[in-house]
């Protein structure tokens, strides 16, 4: 007899090896052919909506691992919400305007080789244009309108390039119709949003210091500034008193000591601002001392005087002391220009470093500007000698025409020459840099357009509305709320104007006399918006003002400024959710999800525009994830050589491995990735796949429509397996997924597969699956539970392992185009006595774990090989005996041993020994009935009955 044919050893088309990198592209092609996203929209139509609004990545360059993390997290949420019973459309988007694209076009125009290799079609257009217009082959002075056309084309190419990589990750979405901030409709609606802000009174023009990048030649948003270490020259500079008598009186003296000059000493890290000094600041409540030194009388904050004098190499005796308030309005002479600087008191002066006296250049510092304006300095009196490219105006004495960074050492020399330099030394400190050019930026006063944070509109300010918006938003993780709250509470007015070409215009006509917008501005903005909606932003830049203004055109200038790109993305709730994609989406969004840097970026700008336009945040929830670092916690860097590209992972391991890594990592902090970490992820995947393969193989001859048993007819163990599956479902589908705790979900799923399934239930039921009659109730009981467990497990895994879950689902259902994402979470059958059942079997599992340890001791001693070679005798106490006795002979199947004896006793004792019986060739149990039947001398009686007789029945295991 061929015993192998009597055992139910089944196979499955679901292979052991995933071979994901090779097979995933084929599955993606099938999804596209099946129009999976569109089909899903039809299936989910009419359900409650869940809107995850995509924060647009910038359309420039290949996606990196951070992009992959972001898109995968979004996809997991969209899929899990869909399976939870929501209509969760996902419309991806791109941020398309702005300086990086302009710079790429500038490089192409100048013939940069790398830029040409990256965008040969754009280079070809430039070449054709030069030929067609009779220009020199290297001509760089091309019309702005043509440059904008090239920017639009370049952005379109980048969108397609990134889209391909995002789709490769398995992300389901409206890829055929994404939103792009450069679509004509979006550009027009941005102008309409601007018009609403203008009408409400939030928008104003003003002179203010704003972040300025000399390389960009433009103002920057706070989100476009990053901090890096920079070494600056620190200087202590003496400003001589212009009013000695008043100074003496301030210190309570009748006169200054005879023959002594007095100076206030300031400390700064920006020597280049000294030519623009217009005031000194002291704190009204600090003590200031007048110190007699070898270099005359010096005014210093009393708490900093000792350190300052040591720094200067001087000794000093305190002559007098006064509060800072007493020095208010006294004047001091500029070190090398013939003018005086008044003292203004200010609460922002600190004793953290320096001298306690701050030099004030109102054109180059926010606090300096506010202090001087508060004390009556008019805008036209503010000195602003630094031009947009970082050079001083030619008319500035001593330093005209020099770049400020080159002028720094020369200014220090000049101060030394005139005897005003008390000390200088280098200081390494954190300093703002342009995020694009990585070069230092400055504050520079320019006339710009601002959204006012503290202008009262309809009874409240934008700051108040935004702070309430933060309070009304749920944050994941929770610490994000305090962070965004602090940013809003302390931020200045929002500078929304930029001096660039490739951006949505601020289409104002300004009166040549007053500089004020045309009285019909709201009406004109709508007229411009309609033109832009038809022709794009070039419609404004090429517009003849007379077309809209008629004879008035001569009295007005057409603005050339463009909007901050953060206004582009910050108004997507207006021009996407309620604009280009209003039919698919809804407002407000349920969730915005981006990296933690977006508290000062997209979350921030969206909050401000939402609260200005609608009085509320445009989102109900905010989720932030950390940045990706290497295995040692270092930032990804080409120079360090630790960059791991998502494309490489997809091509070598498969996107499901990348998705599993993302889902298994706590994204609330930094996400570490390395080859070693990915190997661990691959091992976890392999264990999951092997579990799925076992489940599918043992269901390959099971038809749930004809073979499934009612829950009440299942064995106790199989009902317990359903309880365990229900526990997992409750933890994952009803808790982890709704609160976006994916790493906790994956820990639970992997733990379930390892402990509840592999090490327990599946281990026990193998005997029943393999050795009982194929259509026996005992086997069908196991298969009924297996079917529910498999559907539930695949359903829970599907948001993460979208490719693998699909492959397994189709193997389970036999339907080539089916997918878990088309179905809501699998509804597990109710187990009537679940609580009591679970309590009993939890006790049995604990007992089994103890007995396994004892068997392992025997195995290590060489007494037994497998656990089936062991016999167990249990003396059970009064609490345990009824439970074990009820199982009778089936207890041996639970313990996977050949015999179990149970007797009552005062306390529980366990004895494990090697069996002395013969081994059944078919079931591998050691049993005294082996050899009893001459027809099958190698079989036990149980196996003989399962082959030739009625077959065994099971109630418990």
Curated annotation (Swiss-Prot):
Reactions performed catalytically: tRNA(Ile) + L-isoleucine + ATP = L-isoleucyl-tRNA(Ile) + AMP + diphosphate
Gene Ontology cellular-component annotations: cytosol
Superkingdom per UniProt: Bacteria
Cofactor(s) the protein needs: Zn(2+)
Molecular function, one GO term: isoleucine-tRNA ligase activity
Protein's cellular compartments: Cytoplasm
Family annotation (InterPro entries): aa-tRNA-synth_I_CS, aa-tRNA-synth_Ia, Anticodon_Ile_BEm, Ile-tRNA-ligase, Ile-tRNA-ligase_type1, Ile-tRNA_ligase, M/V/L/I-tRNA-synth_anticd-bd, Rossmann-like_a/b/a_fold
Keyword Aminoacyl-tRNA synthetase: yes
Residues noted as binding Zn(2+) in the record, renumbered to the chain: 920, 923, 940, 943
EC number(s) reported in the record: 6.1.1.5
Motif ('KMSKS' region): 635-639
Residue window of motif 'HIGH' region: 57-67
Entry note about domains: IleRS has two distinct active sites: one for aminoacylation and one for editing. The misactivated valine is translocated from the active site to the editing site, which sterically excludes the correctly activated isoleucine. The single editing site contains two valyl binding pockets, one specific for each substrate (Val-AMP or Val-tRNA(Ile)).
Oligomer and partners: Monomer.
Entry protein name: Isoleucine--tRNA ligase
Organism encoding this protein: Laribacter hongkongensis (strain HLHK9)
């Amino acid at each position: 007899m061929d015993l192998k044919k009597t055992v139910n050893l089944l196979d499955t088309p679901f292979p052991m090896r995933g071979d994901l990198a090779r097979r995933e592209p084929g599955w993606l092609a099938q999804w596209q052919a099946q129009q999976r996203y569109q089909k899903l929209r039809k299936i989910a139509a009419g359900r409650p909506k869940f809107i995850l609004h995509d924060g647009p990545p910038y359309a420039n360059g290949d996606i990196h691992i951070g992009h992959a993390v972001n898109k995968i997290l979004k996809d997991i949420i969209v899929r899990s919400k869909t399976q939870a019973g929501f209509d969760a459309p996902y419309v991806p988007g791109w941020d398309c305007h702005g300086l990086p694209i302009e710079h790429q076009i500038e490089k192409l125009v100048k013939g940069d080789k790398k830029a040409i290799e990256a965008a040969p079609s754009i280079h070809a257009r430039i070449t054709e244009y030069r030929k067609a217009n009779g220009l020199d082959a290297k001509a760089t002075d091309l019309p702005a309108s043509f440059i904008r056309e090239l920017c639009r084309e370049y952005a379109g190419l980048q969108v397609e390039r990134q889209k391909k990589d995002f789709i490769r990750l398995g992300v389901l979405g409206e890829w055929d119709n994404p939103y792009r901030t450069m679509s004509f409709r979006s550009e027009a609606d941005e102008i309409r949003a601007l018009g609403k802000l203008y009408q409400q009174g939030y928008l104003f023009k003003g002179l203010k210091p704003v972040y300025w990048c000399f390389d960009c030649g433009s103002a920057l948003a706070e989100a476009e500034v990053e901090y890096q270490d920079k070494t600056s020259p620190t200087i202590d500079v003496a400003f001589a008193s212009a009013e000695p008598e008043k100074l003496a009186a301030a210190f309570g003296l009748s006169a200054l000591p005879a023959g002594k000059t007095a100076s206030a000493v300031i400390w700064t890290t920006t020597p280049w601002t000294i030519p623009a000094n217009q005031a000194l600041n002291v704190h009204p409540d600090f003590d200031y001392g007048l110190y007699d030194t070898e270099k005359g009388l010096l005014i210093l904050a009393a708490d900093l005087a000792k350190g300052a004098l040591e720094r200067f190499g001087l000794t000093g005796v305190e002559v007098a002391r006064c509060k800072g308030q007493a020095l208010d309005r006294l004047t001091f002479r500029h070190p090398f220009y013939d003018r005086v600087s008044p003292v203004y008191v200010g609460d922002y002066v600190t004793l953290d470093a320096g001298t306690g006296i701050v030099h004030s250049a109102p054109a180059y510092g926010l606090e300096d500007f506010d202090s001087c304006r508060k004390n009556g300095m008019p805008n036209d009196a503010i000195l602003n000698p630094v031009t947009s490219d970082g050079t001083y105006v030619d008319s500035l004495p001593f330093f005209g025409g020099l770049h400020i960074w080159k002028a720094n050492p020369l200014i220090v020399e000049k101060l030394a020459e005139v005897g005003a330099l008390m000390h200088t030394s280098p200081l390494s400190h954190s300093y703002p840099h342009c995020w694009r050019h990585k070069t230092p930026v400055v504050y520079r006063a320019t006339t710009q357009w601002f959204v006012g944070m503290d202008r009262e509109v309809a009874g409240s300010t934008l700051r108040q509305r935004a702070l309430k918006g933060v309070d009304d938003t749920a944050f994941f993780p929770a610490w994000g709320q305090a962070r965004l709250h602090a940013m809003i509470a302390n931020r200045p007015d929002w500078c929304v104007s930029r001096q660039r070409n490739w951006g949505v215009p601020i289409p104002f006509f300004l009166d040549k006399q007053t500089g004020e917008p045309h009285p019909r501005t709201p009406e004109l903005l709508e007229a411009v918006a309609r033109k832009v909606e038809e022709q794009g932003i070039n419609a404004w830049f090429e517009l003849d003002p007379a077309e809209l203004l008629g004879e008035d055109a001569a009295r007005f200038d057409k603005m050339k400024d463009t909007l901050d790109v953060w206004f582009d993305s910050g108004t997507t709730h207006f021009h996407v959710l309620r604009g280009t994609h209003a039919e698919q989406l809804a407002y407000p969004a349920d969730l915005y999800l981006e990296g933690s840097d977006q508290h000062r970026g997209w979350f921030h700008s969206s909050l401000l525009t939402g609260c200005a336009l609608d009085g509320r945040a445009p989102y109900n929830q905010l989720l932030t994830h950390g940045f990706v670092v290497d295995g040692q916690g270092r930032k990804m860097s080409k120079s360090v050589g630790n960059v791991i590209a998502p494309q490489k992972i997809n091509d070598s391991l498969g996107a499901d491995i990348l998705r599993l890594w993302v889902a298994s990592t706590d994204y609330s902090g930094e996400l570490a990735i390395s080859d070693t970490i990915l190997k661990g992820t691959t091992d976890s995947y392999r264990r999951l796949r092997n579990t799925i393969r076992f489940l599918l193989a043992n269901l390959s001859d099971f038809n749930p429509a004809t073979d499934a048993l009612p829950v009440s007819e299942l064995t106790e163990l199989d009902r317990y397996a359903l309880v365990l599956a229900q526990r997992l479902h409750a933890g994952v589908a009803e808790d982890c997924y709704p609160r976006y705790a994916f790493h906790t979900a994956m820990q639970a799923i992997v733990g379930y597969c390892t402990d509840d399934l592999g090490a327990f239930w599946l281990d026990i039921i193998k005997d029943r699956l393999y050795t009982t009659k194929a259509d026996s109730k005992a086997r069908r009981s196991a298969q009924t539970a297996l079917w529910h467990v498999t559907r539930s497990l695949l359903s829970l895994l599907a948001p993460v392992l979208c490719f693998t879950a699909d492959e397994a689902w189709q193997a389970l259902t036999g339907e080539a185009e089916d997918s878990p994402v088309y179905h809501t979470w699998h509804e597990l059958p109710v187990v009537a006595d679940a609580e009591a059942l679970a309590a009993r079997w939890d006790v049995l599992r604990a007992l089994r774990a103890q007995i396994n340890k004892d068997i392992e001791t025997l195995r290590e001693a060489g007494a037994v090989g497998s656990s089936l070679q062991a016999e167990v005798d249990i003396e059970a106490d009064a609490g345990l005996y009824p439970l074990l006795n009820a199982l009778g002979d089936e207890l041996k199947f639970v313990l996977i041993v050949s015999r179990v004896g149970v007797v009552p006793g005062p306390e529980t004792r366990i004895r494990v020994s090697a069996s002395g019986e013969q081994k059944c060739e078919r079931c591998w149990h050691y049993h005294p009935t082996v050899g009893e039947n001459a027809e099958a001398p190698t079989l036990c009686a149980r196996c003989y009955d399962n082959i030739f007789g009625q077959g065994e029945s099971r109630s418990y295991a």
